[in-house]
Amino acid sequence: LAPQGDLMIGACQGTLPPHLAALLVALPEQDIHLPRGWREREVRQKAWFKAVAGMGQRPDFIGRLGDIWVRSFEGADASTTTYLVSAPFDCVDGALPNENTAEPVRLAAGSCEQAYVRQRVYQVGSDGVPQDITAMAMPAAPSIAEADRARHRAREGKVILDHSKLQYGPAMRWFVQYPESPQKTGPHSFSDWNREHLSFVVWNGTGFELRDTVTRAQWPCDPVAPGDKPCGGFPDSGPDAYVLAGSTVNSAVSSP
């Protein structure tokens, strides 16, 4: 997500919704590398959070606490609420960075001094213990042919999973970001910002799935100033053939 100041438009500031706070406190210490006592103190402090229309009886929520953010996804059964957590899960000691890894963050407490921020998916069991269901619930990144991967590298493209629209709806987006240049990107280019589409990741009420296209309701534009062109701000300006105006979407994933 964007830096904290830009994280959530129209967000509230206060203590996190109880189920988000309970999840963050209950995460196994061996997962998150931050002592439970530290987390118990932190969730009592002011944080930014926002309700998002979802598919359950209660709204989804997104909240941020320092370098940690969490997004809940509701379904028909509140007992199966799913949480996407972005946190310092991989301690630098023993974790190998890759070409798309951001710099590690320094931890405020615990025995791990620095860790890489990753995303994991959790559900809370009947015993109150969060279970890591990432491998089951989150589809792998879309496959990229070796020729396309070589083309990305030649143009200094970076594969990114965009979480920024989770403050509005149920979708994330895989794309390739190229440096600012007049050079045209590949056949799946979109927007005015040197980007190439790979796939969306969409919550469907029970899990996440890859989709080639979504509706505008699933991928809303950021608000713009009064009088400005709708969908005219960063990062929404420019053509985007993968966001449809209608209500029907194609679940097939394109091959970049």
Regions found by a protein language model. Give the residues of each.
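Mid-length scaffold segments of soluble, non-membrane domains
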Residues: 91-99, 103-137
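Short, surface-exposed coil-to-beta transition loops
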Residues: 65, 108-109, 115-119, 156-159, ...
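Sequence contexts marking disulfide-bonded cysteines in secreted/extracellular proteins
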Residues: 11-13, 90-92, 111-113, 220-222, ...
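Short, solvent-exposed mixed-charge patches
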Residues: 254-256
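Terminal domain-start segments
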Residues: 1-78
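Short aromatic loop motif centered on NTY/YTY
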Residues: 130-246
